A protein has these predicted regions:
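Mobile, glycine/GP-rich and aromatic-enriched active-site lid/loop segments adjacent to catalytic centers
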Residues: 104-155, 231-380, 385, 448-567
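Helical element adjacent to the flavin cofactor pocket in flavoenzyme catalytic cores
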Residues: 129-156, 160-179, 219, 225
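N-terminal Rossmann-like FAD-binding beta1-loop-alpha1 element of flavoenzymes
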Residues: 13-39
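Glycine-rich loop(s) and the adjacent beta-strand/alpha-helix scaffold that form part
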Residues: 187-246, 381-394
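Glycine-rich active-site loop/strand segments that organize a redox cofactor
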Residues: 59-91
Length: 567
């Protein structure tokens, strides 16, 4: 099998990733301009990205009596200061606006007898959100002058003189190679799962917290193109219901369940209640012989059993099925909990592209929004929508004010070269290893040497140096891999993306000489927090090597622009 068909497309805006941020950006651009848009989606926008299975709450909302600065303060505290104040505030100021827009599009938001949204805690409101992604996708599909290309896997940016010109990719169903030339590009490809050995083995390995199909393509393309990245060392580890990997927040907030050890002792007060502290406390209780750990649901009101079962059917039905299979309701037994493997995801932590206040990266004309954008944790659904909107608004303004020449007399030659690369991997050559075996080897290395589950999320510099050496060896070996069809070709590039991210992540973990976030970055060489590290750890690939850049914190009242940026 080989790629024989080629297509070159010229457009105003290319959106890579038709998930939460990507779809909302398209809606905003078309509302504010007549720009031509192409959305390149690896799956199908109807059920792609983090919202594919739906959600039962909007977790980032300014409820009555609160203001945007309150949300900024919450996110800053959870991340222990390492956030971009400008990004958090501009996001928080628009959370309610995008929520209202989603309701207008058809999202069902629960209301009380007074017609007010039903709050769940200080920052959340309840929704019936099983169909939230189809609602977004349907709105996009109705837009004029927007071409959605489903099953198109983007593999590389086209960058000249540090300015984005478009991207290359291939279609996984018909095998067409694409070169899409664009005046502006928005990367909205989500975060990175599958770097570490997961909770569940074999067939169930994709029973995980984050979509296994989000493999960090946007990060990897940016790294290889020389974009600056930030805070990868703030990994995200979710505290989940054991085995089902279902959310714990639904129980903790819905019925006020506390974290308890096997002795029935509440331990969350001992370690703290930030996201990383909850994971760390659970890990420590198990290590010190007081596990397993649970969310205490025994004794809750019977009507709450039905509420919890219904809530999980909207988002994680396996948890409801587990209760039914065991023949015990939540009120009759506590729910066992565990931490997941680490992920890189800018919607929960501050990891991702280093962007200016308008969400433009250090590559001119390339924007990032949602999980792929760094500096702004605790985005959740609405934060991703806002970032898509903010990036879109700046894109619209720049399209008005600037002139562009995206054509290149070498377009066909460049696409020919990319097709040769694809077909070299699609060749019939025998490989000693399969792509899946190489992926498992990568996950084993990261698990053992870079702070995975088996090492209790802990690492030291010697281990990280070994991880770097072994990942580099795997990168060399991956050059011998082959793919028998277009689907396997996608798997090859997903592996390539993850290996690229692993190297950058290792450098970030090495660079921060402190332990600011337990479990997220548990550095045994530097087990204490230090004010000397109240700064951003950024990286940039320069001439094939990853360079560490330390930057000072940015506050809410600053409008950050990239300085001394080579063009």
């Amino acid at each position: 099998m080989e790629i024989t068909k080629q297509q070159i497309i010229h457009t105003d805006v290319l959106i890579i990733g038709g998930g939460t941020a990507g779809c909302y950006a398209a809606l905003t651009i078309r509302e504010k301009s007549d720009a031509k848009i192409v959305i390149a989606e690896k799956a199908n926008i109807k059920r792609s990205g983090c919202l594919a299975a739906g959600v039962n709450a909007i977790n980032a909302y300014i409820v009555k009596g609160r203001k945007p600065q309150d949300y900024v303060d919450y996110a800053r505290k959870d991340a222990d200061e390492i956030v971009r104040g400008d990004l958090l505030l501009t996001m928080s100021e628009h959370l309610n606006e995008v929520t209202s827009k989603m309701e207008q599009l058809g999202l069902v938001i629960l209301k009380d007898e007074n017609g007010d949204y039903v709050a769940r805690g200080n920052r959340n409101i309840k929704i019936n959100g099983e169909n939230i992604k189809p609602i977004l996708a349907d709105a996009v599909n109705q837009l004029d002058n927007v071409e959605v290309i489903n099953h198109l896997n983007i593999t590389d940016y086209i960058v000249e003189d540090n300015t984005i010109k478009g991207a290359f990719g291939f279609h996984m169903e018909n095998g067409t190679a694409y070169e899409i030339r664009a005046k502006k590009v928005l990367c909205a490809t989500g975060g990175a799962a599958g770097l570490y050995k997961p909770n569940n083995p074999g067939f169930s390995r994709h029973k995980m917290w984050y979509p296994p199909f989000n493999t960090g393509a946007g990060y990897a393309m940016g790294i290889d193109a020389g974009a600056e990245m930030t805070t990868f060392e703030m990994r995200f580890i979710a505290l989940r219901c054991k085995d089902t990997i279902a959310p714990t927040g639904t129980i903790a907030q819905g019925v006020g369940a506390k974290q308890v050890n096997a002795k029935g002792e509440i331990y969350e007060d001992k370690y703290g209640i930030t996201t990383s502290q909850r994971v760390y406390g659970t890990t420590q209780e198990n290590l010190e012989g007081r596990g397993p750990c649970y969310l205490r649901t025994e004794g809750i009101e019977k009507e709450k059993d039905t509420d919890l079962k219904k809530a999980y059917l909207n988002m994680a039905p396996s948890q409801t099925l587990k209760w039914i299979e065991q023949g015990k309701d939540p009120s009759e037994q506590n729910v066992e909990i565990e931490g997941t493997e680490p992920y890189i995801v800018g919607g929960h932590t501050a990891s991702g592209y280093w962007v200016n206040t308008n969400r433009e990266t250090t590559i001119h004309g390339l924007y990032a929004a949602g999980d792929v954008a760094g500096g702004c944790p605790q985005k959740y659904v609405t934060g991703a929508l806002v970032e898509g909107e903010l990036a879109a608004l700046d894109i619209v303004e720049k399209l008005k004010d600037q002139t562009f020449d995206i054509t290149d007399n070498k377009e066909e030659q460049l696409l020919d070269e990319k097709v040769k690369e694809y077909n070299n991997i699609l060749s019939d050559k025998d490989s000693i290893f399969t792509i899946e075996q190489m992926e498992e080897a990568m996950q084993k290395v990261m698990d053992a040497y870079a702070g995975g589950i088996s090492s209790h999320y802990q690492f030291n510099e010697n281990c990280l140096n070994l991880a770097k050496e072994k990942i580099n060896n795997l990168i060399t070996l991956s050059g011998q891999l082959s793919a028998k069809d277009y689907h396997e070709l996608m798997f090859y590039y997903e592996l390539k993306e993850r290996l690229t991210i692993c190297l950058t992540l290792i450098e970030h973990l090495k660079a921060r000489k402190e332990t600011r976030w337990h479990s997220f970055a548990e550095n045994l060489d530097h087990p204490q927090k230090s004010d000397d590290w109240k700064k951003y750890v950024n990286t940039k690939k320069v001439e094939g090597k990853i360079k560490v850049i330390l930057r000072e914190l940015v506050k809410e009242d600053e409008h950050y622009e990239h300085q001394n940026q080579q063009k």
